Amino acid sequence: MNYIPMTLKGAEKLREELKYLKQTKRSEIIKSISEARQYGDLKENAEYQAAKEQQYFCESRIKEIESKLMHSKIIDIKKIPFRDRVVFGSTITIKNLKTLEEKTYKIVGDDEANFKNNLISISSPLSRGLIGKKTLEIVNINTPSGIIKYKILKINYL
């Protein structure tokens, strides 16, 4: 069975969202449905329809999060023995050999990825190209705009 790699921080964030949806959002939606029922005919009641739609999306998200947490494998970067290679959870500083621009990224699970915050998904082309590589290695990354060469400058395990 395939598992979903996740950092401890990512799992905690999902658990917090799940708690909010179950304990707060659900009761807010139930209250909205109850109030909307008082407006009469449910077939032509826009407030009721909107509340039922919110309920559907909320329950769908709850199921999605529960499934992800059930199938996740929380990876603690500090316990990974490969201290000289790029692995899930490591923070990497790379240099684009064409533009000479340096960037630092952390490889995280799909749900945690946020490119603006330099958090890249384990399933991204950049991560896939970096996994298993060592400091000072040059890697070719296939991107939609062509192959880009990067040099790995530093690997941190934070």
Curated annotation (Swiss-Prot):
Q: Which GO terms describe its molecular function?
A: DNA binding; RNA polymerase binding
Which keywords describe this protein according to UniProt?
DNA-binding, Transcription, Transcription regulation
The record's section on InterPro entries has: GreA/GreB_C_sf (IPR036953), TF_GreA/GreB_CS (IPR018151), Tscrpt_elong_fac_GreA (IPR006359), Tscrpt_elong_fac_GreA/B (IPR028624), Tscrpt_elong_fac_GreA/B_C (IPR001437), Tscrpt_elong_fac_GreA/B_fam (IPR023459), Tscrpt_elong_fac_GreA/B_N (IPR022691), Tscrpt_elong_fac_GreA/B_N_sf (IPR036805)
The answer to whether the entry has keyword Transcription regulation is: yes
UniProt GO BP: DNA-templated transcription elongation; regulation of DNA-templated transcription elongation
What's the superkingdom here?
Bacteria
Tell me its family: Belongs to the GreA/GreB family.
Chain's role:
Necessary for efficient RNA polymerase transcription elongation past template-encoded arresting sites. The arresting sites in DNA have the property of trapping a certain fraction of elongating RNA polymerases that pass through, resulting in locked ternary complexes. Cleavage of the nascent transcript by cleavage factors such as GreA or GreB allows the resumption of elongation from the new 3'terminus. GreA releases sequences of 2 to 3 nucleotides.
Q: What is this protein called?
A: Transcription elongation factor GreA
**Organism of this sequence:** Wigglesworthia glossinidia brevipalpis
